[in-house]
Structure formats: C-alpha cells, structure tokens
Amino acid sequence: MYRCRPEKGFGFCRHSPGEKKPHYLGGYPSIAPPVLLRENGVFGGLDGSLYVVPLSGNGKTWSFKTAFGCPISAPAAVCDGKIYFGCEDGYLYVLGPEGKALLPQKNLQLSKIRSPLKGEMSDPEFNWYSNYGNVSNTNANDQDIAPPLKISWIRRVEGTVKHLPVCGGGRMYTHTAEGQIFAVEQETGRLLWRRYWPEVYLSFTSPIYWQERLLVPQAGMRKSMIRCLDASTGKLIWEVPFTGSPSWSRQAPPVIYKNLAIYASGSGKYAAQGNDKAFIFSGTPLEPLGDMEIMSWMYTHNNPYYPKDNKPLIWAWNVETGEEVWKKDFSHIGLGGNDCGLCLMDGKLYYSTFFGYSSSQKKRRGLPSEPNGLTMAIDPATGDVLWTTTKHYLTAGCTLSGRDGRLYLGGYNQPDESTDERYILCLDARDGSLIWKSDPVKSAVNVVSVGEKFIFSNAIRGDGHLFDRETGKIVSRFNNNYACTRFSLSEPYLLGANLDMVDLSDDYKLVSTGPAIDSRECLGSTVSNGRIFYNSQASGLQVSLLCGPEADSFTVPWKK
C-alpha cells in the first residue's frame, strides 16, 4: 500500500505485509493522495512542488516547483503523457514533454476575504480568539445562542486537531498536530491560506489571534518554535525557540499583554519513549542511560515526579519583533514546568505549575521533596513576582482560569501523597489565599469553565460538575460517558463532542446533537460571533452552524 504523510521523512511511503514500519520512497510531506503509474508515484507536496517518485525506492525523484510555493493538496491526474494538477495558488498546471509555457506571474490573492462575516455579532468583541476563549481562560461566553441549529458549511480537514476553533478577523484558524496552520472564511469555510513547517511532532497546541497577528506554538522533539504569522496571509513575521513538551493537554497558546507575547513551558530531554515509568505513557521504559533522564514526548497523566532537568520557564517576547524582553526560571523552587498554565486578569499575569505529588519518591531520587507546585502573580511588563504560594497549584492536565478577582485551578493528579482525592481550588487573586476547595472530583481536566452564571468542570470518563460560586460545593452533576472532551460554555449551554448542546439551566437536558462527524470525543465546539464552530479531532471535518432566527431563515445548501 502506498500513501502520503504530512510528516518529515514520510512524504511518499510504502507499507508492506510483515513490516511494522513504512518505507520512505521520496518527496516532501504531503496531504494529497498519490497517483500510481506503472513505475512511479505522482503527488503534490505541502511545499508547492509536484513529485514523481520511483515505486521501487531506487532512482532519482523528479520534481516541479509551482509559481508561488503554495501547497498542492488535491490528487494529480495523468493522461496521454501529461500531468494535470491544481494548486492552492488557484492555478491549474499541465506538464508535458514539450511544455514551454511560463509560470504565472499574477498572485490571485485567494487569501483575501470575499464573504465578510455577517450577523449582529460580527464585531471583534465577540471573537473566540484563543483556545479558552480569551486570555483569562474563562472558556465561556454568552451570545444568546439557541436552537434550532443548521449547518452553514462543512469542509474537509487533512490532519489531526486537538484544540478548539479559534476565530478573528472574519477567519477561523486551525493548527494540526503535524505542523499545518491554515485559515478559512468564517462565513463560508473557504480556504484562505495554508502553511506548513516540518519537524512538528504531535503538537496539540492552539493558535491565538491578536490584532491581525496569529501566534502558534509548534513543538517537536528536535526543535520547538513560537511562530508569529500575518493572520491575513499566513506570512511568517518572526519565530523564536522554546523548550519542553506540551504533551497531551497543554493546548494553550501564548497570552498577549499590550506589546508582549508571554508563554510558559518546561525543558529537558525527550524521545518517543522515556526511560522511567513516570516519564512514559504506555509500554516498557527504555533502558537507563547512566544518570540521563529522558521523558516521552507524550507522557503519562500520573505524575509523581519529573526529570531533574525539567525547569519551569516563562518567556516574554515583543509581539511586533519577537525580541526577548524577559525570561524567568523558577527551578530554584521546584522541578517540572510542562504541566503549567498562564492567564491574564486585571493587568496581572498568573502562573501555576506542578512538580509532582510524591514527596517521598522525589526525596529518594535526590530531588527537592517540597513543594509539589506553585502559583504566583507576576507583573507582565517586567516579569517581577508579586506574590507566590506553594500551598495551592495546578495538578497537571489543566490550565488556570481567572474571573472577577478569583483564580480557578484543577488537574489530573492528587495534590500530595496524603490523599487520592482531586479538588478544584478557588484562590483570591490579590494574594493567592484559598477561598474554597471543592468537594472531591475524579479529576478536573483541560480548564475550569467560569461563566457569569455557571462554574463547570469535567473529569475524564467521569462526571461533569457544576459548583456553587461561593462555597465550591457540587450543586449538580451529570455523566454522558464523555472521554477527555474539551467542552466550552456559551451560557446556558455546555458545548460538547459531535455538537452536543446541553442546557445547564434545565437539568442537563440535551437540546441538540449532531451531525456526529467525529469518531472521537476529544473536542467540543465553540461559539464565536454568534455562530457555532467545530473541529473533529480524528475524522477530518470542520463545520459551522447557524443558531436561532438566523438558522430559521437559512436554507441549507443541499436543499437550494
């Protein structure tokens, strides 16, 4: 079997019976289906070149570069000695042995919006512009959505996505785990531009839109970069390196404060498989390499300790130039850093990270036994620490959120060895003191959603909970057997996988569902500019839905 893959070293490859690994034949990473000839495979690459590759794996690969370097995402056709293919630059190319035509010179400006966003909520204040909706990570809004719902558009996605839809400037932006970044019109779903960087590896990170800039952490085992793009064209403006692994659950992009982009991560050595049970996700750890500690790129949600070279780091860069303005290293307090969160509220930056719950195991390994984590307030302009607490902190797999002078922290792990319970914490943002600790929960994953009316958190394959705002008591719960779903909240509705719409004000009534376009349950939908947007995580589709009166007056395309 022959196929293309959007991964460096696997542009065009062959799978053979009895062989566990595919054999790379040639060409650049691609999302286009290959066409097989007698002796060659023909396909277009994400670099804008057409490739003709010998099926034998021997011999020279031939390539043709298109005019503007835009990706080729559709299959080519071969007939009567000619190759026909379309490119995302808008041109149809025909190649043949006697071809003498010049390459096109005119850029067709396909990245320009042709169908501006419509509706009463088309203004920027209604954008869902980050994975958690805003830089406070409330993961919530209220845009008066209501049934009925109708599909406005649906389109194919060639890649794996694990972040919620991000919107701004009339566009929806997507980052695939394999390194693509692309934008489509919010109004129609038409592709505007697509960019690709190799060596991105299982990077489930989200973009953030900010004043016609798009910032995206693109992580890989060989190198990781924060990239700043022109949101209207996808053109790279600047890029800077960072360290650490976002792993499964840190979708968070940088937060933006005035002219600064601020990001938190860890450090250390990584491979596909780590060399300690606490550093891997599954399988057998690698053999120890002396004192060297290696963490799996995708590691476990059970985190008793972290490698000794994992440092909690924060960077701040000038959002216009990428120049580093300040950097902080908190490894003098503890070791960890990947399982962290950042949020902005009322002009202050809040940071929390986890160092592992097992003080006894850390002590035996020669690591600082305490603390197990930290939370702090920081002056975002300078990086100066305003207050620190090591009593209360995230416990991995969850960011922190802020609203109305309060911080909300969750996580996968127990906070320490004295308990197997997990809790949500509410802190006073003025000094980090504890306002309340919730009733026990199985876990609190991704983010605590904090709306004007509701505070919601869900556990992986467990209950979803609503909490009393003043006490943290669980006031109601439900369980539809969701997995690690990244819900969002558009009050009074909770938006889940496959466009489930759950009314939190009416005993968790499921008021709408579908179309069921995803075989997984990792992602919920979001509401931006009065519309619902949804990325399927594993089934390769994106969809936009209209709501209420707008849906009532809309005729779906297949009935026109």
Regions found by a protein language model. Give the residues of each.
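A structural motif specific to WD40 beta-propellers
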Residues: 20-21, 61-63, 103, 152, ...
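Sequence/structural signature of beta-propeller modules
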Residues: 98-146, 549-560
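Glycine-centered loop/turn positions within well-structured domains
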Residues: 48, 59, 90, 179, ...
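Kelch-like beta-propeller repeat domains
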Residues: 101-102, 301, 321-324, 370-372, ...
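Cationic, amphipathic, low-complexity alpha-helical segments enriched
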Residues: 1-5, 12-14, 21
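Short loop/turn segments that connect beta-strands within beta-propeller blades
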Residues: 14-18, 54-58, 97-99, 185-188, ...
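Repeat-blade elements of multi-bladed beta-propeller folds
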Residues: 1-8, 26-51, 55, 68-93, ...
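A short helix->beta-strand "capping" segment at the edge of beta-propeller domains
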Residues: 18, 140-159
